[in-house]
Design a protein with these regions (language model features):
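Short polar/charged helix/loop
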Residues: 32, 40, 50-56, 62-94
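Short cysteine-rich clusters marking metal-coordination/redox-active sites
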Residues: 208-211, 277-280, 293-296
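Cys/His-rich Zn2+-binding "zinc-finger" mini-domains, especially FYVE domains
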Residues: 267-283
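Conserved tryptophan-centered aromatic signature that marks the ligand-binding surface of SH3
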Residues: 286-293
C-alpha cells in the first residue's frame, strides 16, 4: 500500500511552545498558556506527568486532561491514547487550541502527539514520529513508548481491548509493574465460559478431558511465533505481541491463554504454580508470571499454559449453551 506523506506545516522557532499542527503545541512542564503579550495562546491543556498539576499550572486553560505516567518504558500510555486523541480532536474541531505538556517536553508529550498524528492523519508510527522530530529535534520518547505506539499502529490506531495484541500487552505490563502479583484488576480475567449461556458462533470452547467442565474459549488463546530460548521483555521485542495466527504452531503441545476467572484464587500472591481443573482438580498445566518455554522453543511471558492432551475442543456450539451446560 502506498504510504501517505506527513502533513506539511513549517517548523516553528517559538521557544515557549512548539506548534506541531496549527493550534496544537507541545512543551515542557514549566511553560504555560500565555504568549509573548501575556494573552492566552491556548485554550486546553493535556498534561502527562507523575502527579496532577496544581491550580497555578492550570490557570488560563478552559479545559484540561491529566494522564498519570512516569517517563519510563513500563509506563502505560497505550490504554490512554484514544482518550487523548478524542480530547485533542474535540478541542481543535471546536476552534480551540491545545498544549500537550510533560516535564521535559521530549518523551511523554511527544508520544501523545505522535499517536494523535497517526490516528487523525493516517500515518505510520515512523512517519508521524519523523514529522515531530523534524519540527522538534530534541524529541526522543523512550523505547517503551515507541513499542506501545507500534502496537497502536498494529491495532489500526484504536485501542481494542479484545485483541490478542492488547491482551498480551496488558499481561506483560502487569508482570513488569506488579512484581508481587497481588490485587489483580478484574478486567485481566476472561469470563468463565461455564458461567455464561451464550457465546459467539465462531468461538470454540475447551473443556477438561476428565470431567468435561468448560475451561476457556478460543478467543482466550494467545498465539505466538515459534522461537528459541528466553526473549527479552516485550518493550525490547516489538515483534513478539504482534497479530499472530494459530497456524505454524503444530510443534506446540500446550495452549498459552489469558487468565480465566476460575484461576483467580490460584494466581494471587504467587509467581508460579499449577493450573488445576476447578471441578475435578486434575492437573491442566501451569502458570509463571516471569514466563515459561513452549515445546516449540518460544519463551512466553507471562505464561498460563494448558496442555493440549488435558482438554478437548467443543466446536461451534451456536448461540445457546443452556442445554449443553445442563448435561454437565
Amino acid at each position: 500500500m502506498q504510504e501517505r506523506a506527513p502533513p506539511s506545516f513549517p517548523p516553528s522557532r517559538t521557544k515557549a511552545m512548539v506548534p506541531v499542527l496549527p493550534r496544537l503545541y507541545v512543551s515542557g512542564a514549566d511553560l504555560g498558556p500565555a504568549d509573548d503579550s501575556g494573552k492566552p495562546a491556548v485554550t486546553a491543556l493535556l498534561q502527562v506527568d507523575s502527579e496532577p498539576p496544581g491550580a497555578a499550572a492550570l490557570a488560563g486553560f478552559e479545559s484540561t486532561l491529566f494522564v498519570q505516567a512516569l517517563d519510563r518504558p513500563q509506563s502505560d500510555l497505550l490504554s490512554r491514547l484514544d482518550d487523548c486523541a478524542a480530547f485533542l480532536s474535540q478541542v481543535l474541531e471546536g476552534g480551540g487550541s491545545a498544549l500537550v505538556r510533560c516535564h521535559a517536553g521530549v518523551s511523554r508529550s511527544v508520544a501523545i502527539v505522535t499517536a494523535y498524528l497517526m490516528k487523525t492523519n493516517h500515518l505510520t508510527f515512523q512517519e508521524a514520529y519523523a514529522f515531530v522530530q523534524a519540527i522538534k529535534p530534541d524529541a526522543k520518547m523512550n523505547e517503551g513508548f515507541e513499542w506501545q505506539l507500534q502496537l497502536y499502529e498494529k491495532m489500526g490506531c484504536k485501542v481494542d481491548v479484545n485483541s490478542t495484541i492488547y491482551k498480551q500487552y496488558r499481561l506483560k505490563n502487569i508482570t513488569e509493574n506488579c512484581p508481587e502479583i497481588e490485587g489483580l484488576p478484574g478486567h485481566v480475567f476472561a469470563i468463565d465460559p461455564n458461567t455464561v449461556h451464550q457465546i459467539l458462533n465462531h468461538d470454540t470452547l475447551y473443556r477438561c478431558r476428565k470431567c468435561r467442565r468448560l475451561l476457556f474459549r478460543s478467543s482466550s488463546i494467545l498465539p505466538h511465533d515459534e522461537g528459541k530460548g528466553p526473549a527479552a521483555f516485550a518493550h525490547k521485542k516489538v515483534s513478539e505481541p504482534g497479530p499472530l495466527s494459530h497456524a505454524g504452531q503444530t510443534n506446540c503441545t500446550s495452549y498459552f491463554i489469558e487468565p480465566v476467572q476460575w484461576m483467580e484464587a490460584a494466581l494471587l500472591g504467587v509467581l508460579e504454580g499449577q493450573l488445576l481443573c476447578p471441578k475435578c482438580t486434575s492437573k491442566l498445566g501451569s502458570f509463571h508470571w516471569h514466563g515459561e518455554q513452549c515445546s516449540c522453543g518460544h519463551w512466553v511471558t507471562p505464561a498460563f499454559q494448558v496442555h493440549k492432551n488435558r482438554v478437548d475442543e467443543v466446536k461451534r456450539l451456536g448461540k445457546h449453551l443452556g442445554q449443553f451446560l445442563g448435561k454437565m
